[in-house]
Amino acid sequence: MIRAVRAEHFPELRNAEILVLFDKKKRMSGGALVLGRIQKTNDLIKKLSDEVVDEGYDYIMYLDKKMWESSADMDRERVIRHEFRHCFVDLDARGTPYKLIGHTIEDFYEEVELNEDDPRWRVRLGEITYAAYDMED
């Protein structure tokens, strides 16, 4: 699914090496459940992963495992797209062209348009994921 989302919506990331990990810990930020996050790798992580992929990973995407297990494919795609929106390719940069950017609004303008059929998807998915964690306790 991640490859398909990248190919369809983010062709500029076609050469980026992205490691996807499932996060088994409930993470909060600003009182909200973190469904996914992405980080740019540092030199150490790139070096430690250069035997797995040429020159190491450029990004690591973390997806909440409970969210993934309890959500529909459309919601999974929404989370993946949202995280990919943070990625920026700066071809004029020295060194790696892969950067991170913040939100253009609380979300991204492009995501608002793509999710107009379900504008509160993140709240709904957060509640589903919270319920999955509560069942564990």
Predicted regions and their residues:
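Metalloprotease/metallohydrolase-associated module, dominated by Zn2+-dependent proteases
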Residues: 1-18, 22-70, 74, 90-137
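Active-site recognition of the HExxH zinc-binding catalytic motif
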Residues: 78-90
